């Protein structure tokens, strides 16, 4: 038995899900002050009194923004519409579209989870983010 999502509900529900995930994906990091060398060769910390807070978005780092995801959904809809002409079934387009989109979402989630794990391990290892 196949459960078919209506197209508008599925796209609207996914966009609100992305918006909620976007708010949760921001992490705050304290940046260590940059060291600059003076003419005498002495290292001086710039803005040493107040560490700056940097907002890092992992989705933007790996290129999986909402605009990219929306574009992929449009391409998947066109591909599924083209493929559905070979199937003699009334809901062939929706069945194909839902299955392909669920596979894409699972791949996107796995990639995002892997990158965030790598990012967390690098942050805990002591790599600092500096602002220019």
Curated annotation (Swiss-Prot):
Keywords: Membrane, Transmembrane, Transmembrane helix. It comes from Saccharomyces cerevisiae (strain ATCC 204508 / S288c) (Baker's yeast). It is found in: Membrane. The chain crosses the membrane at residues 92-112. GO terms for cellular component: membrane. This is Uncharacterized protein YOR268C. Its main location: membrane. It is a single-pass membrane protein.
């Amino acid at each position: 038995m196949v459960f078919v999502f209506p197209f508008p509900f599925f796209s609207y529900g996914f966009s609100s899900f992305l918006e909620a995930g976007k708010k949760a994906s921001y992490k705050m990091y304290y940046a260590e002050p940059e060291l600059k060398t003076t003419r005498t060769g002495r290292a001086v910390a710039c803005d040493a009194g107040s560490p700056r807070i940097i907002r890092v978005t992992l989705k933007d780092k790996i290129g999986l923004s909402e605009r990219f995801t929306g574009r992929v959904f449009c391409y998947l809809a066109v591909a599924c519409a083209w493929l559905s002409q070979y199937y003699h079934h009334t809901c062939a387009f929706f069945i194909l579209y839902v299955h392909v989109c669920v596979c894409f979402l699972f791949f996107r989630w796995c990639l995002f989870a892997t990158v965030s794990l790598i990012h967390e391990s690098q942050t805990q290892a002591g790599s600092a983010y500096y602002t220019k």
